[in-house]
């Protein structure tokens, strides 16, 4: 007997992934084309809904061109919107792949995929923090404007800091990703991310966490702007 109710509907929905049946939009990435359906993309993503149902090029041409991600990430994202699951079958590190899945979900505002990729990423980091691609995953996490995965990598790094500092890749990460370093140092001192005050640099407009006393000079971890009055630039 065929599955009934929601389970049966979701099972049937998978059959429309990259299918000609009722397809009314094409998603392209690096020369590859994926057949999709406007109603499915719009239901998952306000970003896609706006692009496909407004006075935009994507709406008139029935085509969405994604340029900032590898086709494997785009394919996995599309598979998810039809099945609510994705798997990494491309030989990429799980940490890196899941971080990129969260990144594309963040960019295109797909809440369900953000939740799923965060869950997978947390598991991957817990088991793979000692691997050489951990710094790569951290760098991807800090490319996003949202802090969604940052607590995961900061906690993992703080718990294993002695072993990580022996790795050249991690040391280079701390030099090239100052926001990660700015989050990690207070955490190592026993101050979790949520307890830190948030500041917005008036020079470069970047936000960062910290604990600044009144009087001494402190520097923005991004642009190195020196100030003694950071209390005037607290933000949320």
Task: State where each predicted segment sits.
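Short cysteine-rich clusters marking metal-coordination/redox-active sites
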Residues: 199-204, 217-223
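Short functional micro-motifs and their immediate structural scaffolds
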Residues: 207-213, 227-231
């Amino acid at each position: 007997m065929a599955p009934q109710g929601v389970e049966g509907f979701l099972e049937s929905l998978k059959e429309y992934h990259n299918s000609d049946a009722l397809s009314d939009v094409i998603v392209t990435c690096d020369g590859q084309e994926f057949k999709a359906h406007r109603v499915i993309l719009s239901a998952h993503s306000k970003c896609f809904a706006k692009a496909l149902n407004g006075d935009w090029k994507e709406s008139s041409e029935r085509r969405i061109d994604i340029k900032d991600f590898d086709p494997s990430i785009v394919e996995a994202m599309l598979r998810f919107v039809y099945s609510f699951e994705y798997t990494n079958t491309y030989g990429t590190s799980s940490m890196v792949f899941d971080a990129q899945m969260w990144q594309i979900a963040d960019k295109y505002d797909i809440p369900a995929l953000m939740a799923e990729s965060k869950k997978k990423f947390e598991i991957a980091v817990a088991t793979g923090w000692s691997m050489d691609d951990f710094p790569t995953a951290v760098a991807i996490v800090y490319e996003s404007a949202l802090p969604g995965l940052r607590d995961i990598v900061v906690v993992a790094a703080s718990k294993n800091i002695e072993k990580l500092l022996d790795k050249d890749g991690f040391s280079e990460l701390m030099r090239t990703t100052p926001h990660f370093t700015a989050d990690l140092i207070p955490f190592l001192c026993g101050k979790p991310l949520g307890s830190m005050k948030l500041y917005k640099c008036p020079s470069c407009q970047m936000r960062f966490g910290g604990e600044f006393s009144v009087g001494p000079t402190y520097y923005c971890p991004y642009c190195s702007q020196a100030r003694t009055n950071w209390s005037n630039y607290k933000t949320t």
